[in-house]
């Protein structure tokens, strides 16, 4: 059974309603290029953090000796990475997120020294400021290296001064001594400000002050309103999706599971669910503050690149660890075998479930999911983005809101925020695996509906 006629992605962006059937496709073709994917599948839990960086740097790996000369490295297992990730500045092997960018230890230290010591005023390029940066040239031209750091997204406001580092260490030592004198010997209880999924984003938890790292942190009125709007928009879009449930091709029951008709029906069933998800994401994006301020081309570019990643986030959100199944639209529940019967490859199915399990361990609530999705949408490094600076500026309030929210919700878990951002790196990996899956479907002569073909740039 064929899937229902769907609309072009190009049609719904400026308006306020869901895509309309029969609309012509006129969106620009997106080249299959962009940021180099990070191979290796979903990321493990991040084992350490760098106290010398501010929280917005999400600098969670090897501490820089020059930032904390008296600090001894902690013993234990080395931080695990996703694979052979590359530094976004010089192309060397990356060690983690530093100052908001996946980068190597060398570029991390260089950027910090440049900011703290005012190196930008002293650097000069002999080649007119056009040097191509790599692991060799990074030592030859400091001006172009600093320029590339900023172009990659490193933020000066994430760098702490020596005085700030010293005060932060003193404050932490005082907190630790107070904790030891007040707490009885034994396992530490859970924080009263921590809560499970579904916590109210604007209630007492988000608006109250925490302890430890969360002490003094409070959401602004604008941040509380932003979170409430995002959560409400997601709920509204989700309810609209339920109304499309009767339109989905039924999952074949009782028929020969290996018959051609049954295989086609299962494939149609999954593609129609994907169409509903895409329409829900487009509808949600239009309600994200700032999205409709962008030009039409950038709206399309951001949606084309982020849709599959948001779909995977929503898939993880619906994962049931007890049954190891994923539920869509309340009534459709699927196991790994069901995904395989629908024509998906094990190489794509297994990472989906691994990612879903990792997300469940984080225990995100509705507000955190909504903020993470908004951050994902406003990714300035997507292919064909015309105004990356504007996109990055729109993303920043959501990053800051998520940082504050997580520090209030789980003040004792300093790694929660960087772990969330690392999940966005995992999504880039899954996105590249998805591209391979789409190519495999084409080899099987399985034709995708027009909307999915357009948004995933499948050209027959």
UniProtKB/Swiss-Prot annotation:
Annotated Gene Ontology cellular component terms: chromatin; cytoplasm; cytosol; nucleoplasm; nucleus; RNA polymerase II transcription regulator complex
DNA-binding region: 84-161
Major localisation: nucleus
Post-translational modifications: Sumoylated by SUMO2 at Lys-409 and Lys-447 during the hepatic acute phase response, leading to promote interaction with GPS2 and prevent N-Cor corepressor complex dissociation.
Keywords, ordered alphabetically: Activator, DNA-binding, Isopeptide bond, Metal-binding, Nucleus, Receptor, Transcription, Transcription regulation, Ubl conjugation, Zinc, Zinc-finger
Cross-link named Glycyl lysine isopeptide (Lys-Gly) (interchain with G-Cter in SUMO2), sites: 409, 447
One of the GO BP terms on file: response to nutrient levels
InterPro entries registered for this protein in UniProt: Liver_X_rcpt, NHR-like_dom_sf, Nucl_hrmn_rcpt_lig-bd, Nuclear_hormone_rcpt_NR1, Nuclear_hrmn_rcpt, Znf_hrmn_rcpt, Znf_NHR/GATA
Superkingdom of source: Eukaryota
Residue stretches of biased makeup (Pro residues): 36-45
Domain NR LBD positions: 222-460
Stretches for region Disordered: 1-78, 169-216
Region entry Transactivation AF-1, spans: 1-85
Record carries keyword Iron-sulfur: no
Biased composition (Low complexity): 1-14, 175-198
GO MF annotations in UniProt: apolipoprotein A-I receptor binding; ATPase binding; chromatin DNA binding; DNA binding; DNA-binding transcription activator activity, RNA polymerase II-specific; DNA-binding transcription factor activity, RNA polymerase II-specific; nuclear receptor activity; nuclear retinoid X receptor binding
ZnF (NR C4-type) residues: 87-107, 125-149
Region of interest (Transactivation AF-2), residue spans: 219-460
Compositional bias ranges of the Gly residues kind: 199-215
Function: Nuclear receptor that exhibits a ligand-dependent transcriptional activation activity. Binds preferentially to double-stranded oligonucleotide direct repeats having the consensus half-site sequence 5'-AGGTCA-3' and 4-nt spacing (DR-4). Regulates cholesterol uptake through MYLIP-dependent ubiquitination of LDLR, VLDLR and LRP8; DLDLR and LRP8. Interplays functionally with RORA for the regulation of genes involved in liver metabolism. Induces LPCAT3-dependent phospholipid remodeling in endoplasmic reticulum (ER) membranes of hepatocytes, driving SREBF1 processing and lipogenesis.
Family membership noted in the UniProt record: Belongs to the nuclear hormone receptor family. NR1 subfamily.
Subunit field text: Forms a heterodimer with RXR. Interacts with CCAR2 (via N-terminus) in a ligand-independent manner. Interacts (when sumoylated) with GPS2; interaction with GPS2 onto hepatic acute phase protein promoters prevents N-Cor corepressor complex dissociation. Interacts with ABCA12 and ABCA1; this interaction is required for ABCA1 localization to the cell surface and is necessary for its normal activity and stability.
Name used for this protein in its record: Oxysterols receptor LXR-beta
Record organism: Homo sapiens (Human)
